[in-house]
């Protein structure tokens, strides 16, 4: 096996590794080269700090990939913690143990880093342990700890909506139904709108507007640069039916919206916003329930609420997934 490094951003496309993302159970939208390329173009600090890394087998076939960025003398997975929930390598499952060993063996030969701060590694995926063990074997000093916002609740979905409801504790099932009935009783029938090519721009405008109306840190998140990133995500992934912008319309008003991704059997809730004028009727909660229903109808087996240990996520029956961080230093 051979490890190849590249500092050329053109290799996001020239060495496209989307097939490896799909082959790896750890692969997510955040590992796709199209997502990482977009992140790099919008948030990359300096062009010469990119380090794309590929593993090739004896036949020269690409079997694994990981994108890094270097900040001073620290090596990090590419992807900011504010917008990238999971990070790290992807590869063919049968090669991952060897890839982890060869990766560290190649990295220690480089003199452009002293420490590695590797975030976004889910505890229930092999890469966390493989990278930790391989770094130890290479004589590096390794520390494992919780990542920032290091809990990502998720649901395992049954084949039907009724099956999902029946899988919940009675109290949660009752609350989901009660919120929808209360919204209809007090505001009239609601409608779920999923953005398509024609409606995307005005719906994104409304989503950004609602986001900036939020209280606290959420209200200042959607700065112009972040808005551009979200719009570029939509433009890149809506045609592939990966990007999902959903609204709940009540009384002729778009009361709440969610942005998510539908990717390889997993539907993810990436961001949300709601009109505070409707807060007492919880349209956002009703909308998330409808997002789950839509995911089930589309055959998804997982609904990932992503990082952030917020109480509302558990009202849908989610269970926590820990997301870990490896801090690796040269001795």
Predicted regions and their residues:
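Conserved beta-strand edge residues that scaffold enzyme active sites
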Residues: 197, 309-310, 327
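Short functional hotspots where side chains directly engage DNA or cofactors
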Residues: 315, 325-327
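A conserved beta-strand-loop-helix scaffold within acyl/acetyltransferase catalytic domains
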Residues: 2-59, 65-76, 121-152, 156-280
